[in-house]
Amino acid sequence: MEELQGYLEEDRSRQQQFLYPLLFQEYIYVFAYDHGLNSSIFYEPQNSLGYDNKFSSVLVKRLIIRMYQKNYLIYSVNDIYQNIFVGHNNYFYFNFFSQILSEGFAVIVEIPFSLQLISSLEEKEIPKSHNLQSSHSIFPFLEDKLLHLNYLSDILIPYPVHMEILVQILQSWIQDVLSLHLLQFLLHEYYNWNSLIIPKKSIYVFSKENKRLFWFLYNLYIYEYEFLLVFPCKQSSFLRLISSGVLLERIHFYVKIEHLGVYRIFCQKTLWIFKDPFIHYIRYQGKSILGSRGTHFLMKKWKYHLVNFWQYYFHFWSQPYRIDIKKLSNYSFYFLGYFSSVQINSSMVRNQMLENSFLMDTLTKKFDTIIPIIPLIRSLFKAQFCTVSGYPISKPIWTDLADCDIINRFGRICRKLTHYHSGSSKKQSLYRMKYILRLSCARTLARKHKSSARSFLQRLSSGLLEEFFTEEEQVIFLIFPKIISFYLYGSYRERIWYLDIIRINDLVNCLLVTT
């Protein structure tokens, strides 16, 4: 335990201690605005507040002063009960200012971790592999490893029910007392406001309205959990997991293995436990998968170990049903928009030896991935491309655009979705999705010009079809225009994994979340 504490202190020793003064620097909020706040509350003019969409450290100073004023919350609560309109207006004031402060605070606390990531890559001379950044890079790994496993644990990683637990984890990394005190005070005030206005859990509301800060604290919690989980493995080999360094990029992966060595001080039995290649751990978007070639009893031990680990180290109870143990041969698990399973195929082989012949039953395993059609249609329905049953409809909000822009938008969405789901072994779902988007595009154009969708399909038959092809299909269509139907029916049925998918389309992300 002392050795573990030493490693934790060594990793945390690089963190900067004085971050509080950065809260009052103008460029911090410029960075926060440029990072992607155009879709948040700051993008809309705040005429009701008396300010425009520009914000500065002056607003942050006002918020901090009002927060630390004596009996500020009591006066605010009395305003709510005296005048409900004034109360909601004060809530809007506080919500607006707290988002500014939380975004600025998120930028500040990310600075030392970003510096640690850069220095770690430079010291270890680890090259950045762009292929391993793709979310598709995990599927070839699954295809290679799952064929040898027996059981799979589908784990839904729990998160603390209160933000204070996440702040305590941050406290072990950053020694700036003023910044931590301000964050705790802000969360306390935020919880009190939302308990009066919105009858929901504070962590749920906070995660929706302060995404950047929440995801930073959540990723810090994930790193702490995984660091302690794989610590024995790190001590038995020179394989250093650097996923903690990639904390801020989340889905990015770097080359982790160059040379694999073993410390000789460990006995062979201990090394076999830690270096067993048939125990694999994978995590993505709050879910993780633990696969093993061992018995069901071994997987149950892992299950209760994780439950007790969350309870005693992070001080919150995780329900055991969040960890589902299944036999891999009878189970298909949902992961990254695919239903994945290991299929067992049986084939009879006749063997002839001299005058004797006999039959041999050969079993082969195959990793299979298919697209769930219902969640895919649900995501298209939420984007208003079709009805709940999958019937294509027009998109009225795009009728003000030019015809070429409408076609380009539909085609771009279709190509991206097809590009992401190209790893499916059954393409019927992709063909149906293309049909929905193509007909929705025609109905949108027909609604704009007050015509029928059939006329647009006849007029733009070939041109409209090309816009919905992927880049590979467009090349073959230009070279061999007469064999495109054969191409779609034949070789296009093969599974293809692309290693250039860094960001996920909104529709794909909706599909991942809603399933």
From Swiss-Prot:
One of its GO terms (molecular function) is RNA binding. The keyword RNA-binding applies. It holds the Pfam family Intron_maturas2. GO terms for cellular component: chloroplast. It comes from the Eukaryota. Keywords: Chloroplast, mRNA processing, Plastid, RNA-binding, tRNA processing. It is found in: Plastid, Chloroplast. Usually encoded in the trnK tRNA gene intron. Probably assists in splicing its own and other chloroplast group II introns. Belongs to the intron maturase 2 family. MatK subfamily. This is Maturase K. It comes from Zingiber officinale. The gene is matK.
